[in-house]
């Protein structure tokens, strides 16, 4: 799974964004707090995101890591507003980053210190963090000189507003905020003011779609739609094609060059509080079942045919650029994240090219009922080929190579079917398929989705006895876990329970925190915390198919 997501010559993804949890609920349950009390040592292993990032860096060391928060732990909440609270939030972040480096050997790349989806960006905390990161001297002994430099170079993201457009005006009015912010991130809209585009084109700031929708349910079920727009296809309203179409429109309307999915991977129990919508489902660790949504193939039409990622300071990393004059948005961008061009509207296209002009790819997204034909004029390029390779996705036929299209008199004509994605590229490459058992990648799930049903020990599958699940919370016979260190490039082993921050197996917390202590399940927090979505504390274990089991007495 990780190799498919982060591996290959042209990786599908190059960034991992994770939440600094406070044991309160976000969209998908409670994210564990790495530092629940001011006087305890931070423990990054409580958060699976830090572990996942290390595993991703084993595959691709260039993967970037960004973190942000919804709220904060109660010991931070108790501090006075202003500098005292800024210092407490910074301490929480800093000590977590220090611990993550000690355990996994990397320093995060980006921080948004402000509250996620704030309605009023806090210039004070943005400036406080930028200054503190740059001037930090109190490093632990395990921090190398290279790690210290990486820490001083952590970049600031602001301000992850939900549709709001307040951060750029704040940057224009406050030079300290302007200097502090490296990346401008906002959510759930493709357009912005002209000043956001200027921030990218003139001021050389990064502009991100820092939270956007993933798919709306399993994409292969889209063909069951009966509405006229997109009936029987992967297109239409709130469809996989509509999702993909937001990328070129967001570039045209606000110069976004990063799209972050909420969530990219779903590993929380179905029905927990929020309808699951993800690119990849891996929520049954006892079965090994993984569902690869077909929209991953649609995204591959972009990232598998270009060198994506971050350019270095000397502009020698060879990262491809999006060409504004060869990119078009079908609906011209909107403050409605579900906007489409309509059943008889335009198609979008986006062109990425190598800095030396030797290669390029154009991606066409046609979320309409009409076939389109485009002429690609290959002027001002240094091409060594006389034809373009064509890759197409239509309903139930994903990322398939077609016949090459000749470039004649500097022009290539590309036909784009209704409700499809087509990539025309100079690259002679074959994208990876889903890692299915037969190697074809033509179906979308791995092993059979085994139900969670154990014997009285909790260690063996048994659907014939009277037990559904058992756990003694000791884990003494569990094998040690392999942990990768991105600095040394080596793997070590760690105690099973310690490696997971003393969190119980298969249990998902909501509105609180539960840990394993001395072979017992313990509720950790004795008071509620600020959270996005309130409710009573619970920890949940199970399988939705237990609904068919007879009542227990």
Task: Please annotate each region the language model reported.
Residues 209-330:
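Aromatic/acidic polysaccharide-binding cleft in carbohydrate-active enzymes
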Residues 542-553:
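A carbohydrate-recognition surface predominantly in extracellular/luminal proteins
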Residues 1-109, 113, 123, 127, ...:
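N-terminal catalytic cores of secreted or lumenal carbohydrate-active enzymes
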Residues 88-110, 117-219:
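Active-site neighborhood of glycoside hydrolase catalytic domains
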Residues 509-541:
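Short carbohydrate-recognition loop motifs
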Residues 434-510:
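Extracellular carbohydrate-recognition regions
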Residues 318-384, 419:
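Carbohydrate-binding surface patches
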Residues 404-451:
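C-terminal beta-strand-rich structural cap/linker in extracellular carbohydrate-active enzymes
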